[in-house]
Regions:
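Short beta-strand-turn/beta-hairpin segments enriched in glycine/proline and small hydrophobics
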Residues: 1-11, 28-44
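Short histidine-centered loop motifs in beta-beta connectors
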Residues: 8, 14-18, 22, 51-54
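Surface-exposed, flexible loop/turn segments at secondary-structure boundaries
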Residues: 20, 37, 57
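Short hydrophobic beta/alpha edge segments that flank linear recognition/processing sites
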Residues: 24-39, 61-70
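PDZ-domain C-terminal substructure recognizer with occasional recognition of PDZ-binding tails
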Residues: 47, 52, 58-66
Length: 70
């Protein structure tokens, strides 16, 4: 399992992946908004999305787990 974590404090603007999706390395999983900038959260490797631990509009902290890949 691989945990994809937030690299900064921000809010979840849009989630583009869902549980069960097969993703490739560097696929965009979600977009965070921080200080009026959009930051793409990408898959660090290919795999299957097991769990998305946030929802749109959630405020996330640096280091918070956003997505779990199989």
């Amino acid at each position: 399992m691989t945990e994809v974590k937030a690299e900064l404090v921000g809010s979840v603007w849009k989630i583009t992946a869902k549980s069960g999706d097969e993703v490739a390395e560097d696929d965009v999983l979600m977009i965070l908004e921080s200080m009026k900038m959009e930051i793409s959260v990408t898959a660090p490797r290919a795999g299957k999305v097991l769990e998305i631990r946030v929802k749109e509009t959630d405020v996330v902290k640096e280091g918070q787990v956003l997505v779990v890949l199989e």
